[in-house]
């Protein structure tokens, strides 16, 4: 179970707001880690959350008995391998409408012919795979490959 994960964005408040909308949740400032950070909270009863930091933010270990610290790298790459699949109660057309409103690329894909996702490219650089209720069922019903 993943309770939260973090991504970086040029406009953290905007990106957190869109993720919250996909979840029918809410977005709020989240300053504990980095200045200008926001969080999208799902209305799922489990406090699922996506933390959205300023572009270039890097979490680094702190010395001694201290929390990880956030440092901004001005040379941050535009694209990364980091992505997540998130569930939404919205219909496909609603997800596409949100992406279109924001000016972000979105398209339906069938992963390996097994389950569908809507690729939503936040700020046209960070991938989230959005699964509607039908797609969630396809994903949950996957049979794991046989073990060794």
In which residue ranges do the predicted regions lie?
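Short, flexible active-site-adjacent loop segments at beta-strand->alpha-helix junctions, enriched
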Residues: 56, 90, 110, 124, ...
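Amphipathic N-proximal alpha-helical interface segments
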Residues: 53-67, 127-135
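Core segments of cupin and vicinal oxygen chelate
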Residues: 7-58, 97-112, 122, 144-147
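Vicinal oxygen chelate
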Residues: 2-10, 41-42, 63-93, 118-120
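Acidic, proline/glycine-rich low-complexity IDRs
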Residues: 117, 121-148
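Short acidic, gly/pro-rich beta-turn/loop elements at beta-sheet edges
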Residues: 15-17, 60-62, 94-96, 130, ...
């Amino acid at each position: 179970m993943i309770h939260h994960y973090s991504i970086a964005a040029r406009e953290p408040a905007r990106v957190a707001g869109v993720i919250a909308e996909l979840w029918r949740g809410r977005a709020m400032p989240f300053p504990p880690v980095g200045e200008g950070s926001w969080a999208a909270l799902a209305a799922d009863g489990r406090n699922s959350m996506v933390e959205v930091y300023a572009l270039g933010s890097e979490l680094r270990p702190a010395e001694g008995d201290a929390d990880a610290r956030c440092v901004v790298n001005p040379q941050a790459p535009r694209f990364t391998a980091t992505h997540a699949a998130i569930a939404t109660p919205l219909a496909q057309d609603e997800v596409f409408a949100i992406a279109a409103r924001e000016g972000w690329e979105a398209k339906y894909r069938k992963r390996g012919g097994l389950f569908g996702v809507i690729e939503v490219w936040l700020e046209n650089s960070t991938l989230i795979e959005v699964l509607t209720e039908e797609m969630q069922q396809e994903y949950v019903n996957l049979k794991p490959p046989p073990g060794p």
